[in-house]
């Protein structure tokens, strides 16, 4: 009976005309033991009251905010989130069997099951309907204070309410749901749930949220998951929608063709992309790699040179140009019958020609082992002991 008394006391506390956030907190603290006590935890009225307290406390927070008072954004948002949970419990428990005059359960002729009625559901539903959009607002507020879990849950509650069929007032346009799912995906990514984020971004796109960021975030998440095929598939969808406005999509597709040895397909796609954007250094470098794979590095050199002309900080482009001269010097050395100083006079100028490109590439990307080995060889052959010692000291 003690917990029944707690429920009654909490109900009386919130029936006062002048209430504050602290009043609602106190009322909920009075009620809280009843949510777990066997006497009261299986009663719909217990949970309906808990829901009402949380929603009205949320409203009081909002009133305070609107008149310029400082409010606890996180506590405000979680009051609404808790109200959803308590409301669902109330609705689940709010079934009263209809009895006949003899006290026996009445049977529904259509279903053959006992007839039931509800006592609290109407009020619970009405409160939620009135606050449906507040869940979307609360999600944004919680996100802004970096409460990723809270934002995720508030947006999930919003979408779950929109999917209910027990009241036509829940209906929300699909495009709004899609946008909310996108933001929920961002929250999932922020809290480290990358798999959930990928699914939510997909749901957003399927619902009509086809903004570029819905593809870009998903690509990033798929990459983090090492889902190579997923990245390629989504890049294809993004390329079909956005074309070469963002070269990252076509680069992914071209690299995939190259990795699978489908050079003709890679070439065709590259030519299409370069025709649209001939000042993209990475496309020029990729074109060179494809041409080299199909033919030789001599035919690829114009593309590598164009790449570093457009962007002298393109490490791969610098490496490829330097690699051309380094390989040329190595071949000359292998094929020549000269020895000693005469051989050095023949090949060292070509090694020297390779050096600035390779050093530039190394300064940008020192993790390229092939590049480091080439520099080590050149420094040795040119007698540059200090540079050789420096690069020898680098650990793999």
Show where each model-derived region lies.
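Residue at a conserved register position within TPR or TPR-like alpha-solenoid repeats
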Residues: 13, 54, 142, 181, ...
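Canonical tetratricopeptide repeat
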Residues: 49, 176, 183-186, 217, ...
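TPR alpha-solenoid repeat register
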Residues: 46, 167-169, 180, 213-214, ...
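Short coil/linker segments at helix-helix boundaries
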Residues: 18, 22, 41, 53-145, ...
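Short coil turns that delineate tetratricopeptide repeat
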Residues: 39-41, 95, 163, 209, ...
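Conserved structural position within tetratricopeptide repeats
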Residues: 29, 33-36, 92, 160, ...
């Amino acid at each position: 009976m003690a917990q029944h008394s707690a429920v009654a006391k909490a109900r009386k506390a919130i029936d006062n005309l002048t209430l504050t956030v602290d009043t609602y907190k106190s009322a909920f603290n009075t009620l809280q033991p009843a949510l777990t006590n066997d006497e009261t935890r299986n009663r719909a009225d217990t949970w309906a009251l808990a829901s009402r307290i949380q929603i009205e406390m949320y409203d009081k927070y909002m009133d305070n905010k609107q008149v310029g008072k400082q409010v606890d954004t996180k506590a405000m948002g979680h009051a609404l989130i808790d109200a959803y949970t308590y409301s669902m419990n109330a609705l689940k428990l709010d079934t009263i069997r209809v009895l006949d005059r003899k006290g026996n359960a009445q049977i529904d002729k259509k279903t053959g099951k006992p007839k039931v009625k509800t006592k609290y559901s109407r009020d619970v539903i009405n409160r939620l309907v009135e606050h449906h959009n507040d869940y979307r607002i609360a999600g944004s507020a919680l996100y802004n204070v970096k409460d990723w879990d809270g934002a995720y849950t508030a947006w999930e509650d919003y979408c779950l309410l929109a999917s209910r069929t027990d009241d036509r007032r829940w209906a929300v346009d699909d495009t709004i749901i899609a946008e909310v799912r996108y933001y929920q995906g961002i929250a999932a990514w922020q809290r480290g749930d990358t798999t959930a984020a990928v699914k939510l971004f997909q749901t957003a796109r399927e619902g009509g949220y086809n903004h570029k960021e819905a593809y870009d975030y998903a690509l990033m998440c798929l990459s983090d998951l090492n889902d190579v095929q997923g990245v390629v598939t989504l890049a294809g969808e993004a390329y079909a929608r956005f074309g070469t406005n963002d070269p990252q999509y076509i680069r992914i597709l071209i690299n995939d063709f190259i990795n699978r040895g489908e050079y003709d397909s890679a070439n065709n796609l590259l030519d299409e992309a370069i025709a649209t954007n001939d000042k993209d250094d990475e496309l020029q470098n990729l074109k060179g790699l494809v041409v080299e794979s199909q033919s030789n590095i001599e035919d690829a050199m114009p593309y590598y040179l164009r790449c570093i002309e457009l962007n002298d900080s393109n490490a791969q482009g610098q490496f490829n140009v330097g690699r051309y001269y380094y390989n040329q010097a190595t071949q000359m050395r292998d094929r020549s019958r000269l020895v000693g100083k005469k051989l050095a006079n023949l090949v060292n100028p070509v090694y020297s020609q390779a050096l600035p490109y390779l050093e530039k590439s190394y300064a940008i990307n020192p993790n390229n082992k092939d590049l480091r080995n080439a520099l080590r060889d050149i420094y040795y052959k040119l007698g540059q002991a200090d540079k050789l010692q420096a690069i020898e000291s680098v650990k793999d």
